[in-house]
Amino acid sequence: MKNNVFKVVLLQALPASGKSEVRNFMAHVEPERLQNEFHIGENLQLDDFPYVHMMRRIDEELAKLDKPRVFYPGEAPFLDGRDWGTLCNLLNEDYHDLMNRNIAKPDSAAKLLFDRFDRAAAGAGIPNRLGVLDENTRNTIAERLEKEARAMLDEKHAGYPESFENKTIIIECARGGPDGAAMPLTGTFGYQYSLPMFCPEILEQAFILYIWVTPEEYRRKNADRADPNDPGSNLHHGVPMAVMLGDYGCDDMEYLIKTSEVENTVTVNAHGKTYHVPIGVFDNRVDKTSFLRGEPETWAADKVADVNRAIRTATDNMFSHYNG
């Protein structure tokens, strides 16, 4: 029987563009309608933001011990831009663990996470950083982060389904470049760097749902949503200003769409192959999604209808490339 739902959707946009809000919206749509109207099955969700949060938490604990930070120099962009690839490799690993329902049973979830960070970074060309910490430092920060790391691991395992029938894996991430940068972006900036870092198994099945906002609008929304009491939340975390301007001052998705070899796709050269990844664009330049951060019972019907139309326009365009 033909499966009429996307297997993998890359949900991509600048931070605070509405990605998590759209994901939250889809979680509250009846499964049958989600499939029939949007070609999206029950969501299995992967997101690199929890890893960004834990990178910052590791650095915070290192700083408390008067040790050098390894990921960020403070409220600023990565020390090593190749860590955008580290994040992609972590998502690749999460994808493989999901598909194989791999269950890890470590004595220390934090130390397992440290090892995963080093392994993913090695795949992006970065030498070990956490594995070379002295034993006392490593043990101390592992103890301080164990509760958070264990919760992440438990949540990951809890997301494994009994079956993948009528399921869609939603992989959420944000990429960009410096404010005012010329196109094409180069180096480790933008989707031009990160998309080829995804594994073949993802790229072969992926469709991109891109949420389009202007940098000015996303900066406004970032300030509106930021809750200092909930920095690890998908819906309420904020991005530091230096990062907004240095890493997310612009993005290159519009450029990649315009220069793709095939219309309504993004051309990705990776793993010795060329992938033409279909893309649909949700135009959120005039904010349609901020209300979705509230409780569902407060969602106004006319605003829900606007979101329905915008998502359906994007997913219908994506589905025009679908082969089952």
Where are these regions (language model features)?
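Glycine-rich phosphate-binding loop of ATP-dependent small-molecule kinases
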Residues: 1-324
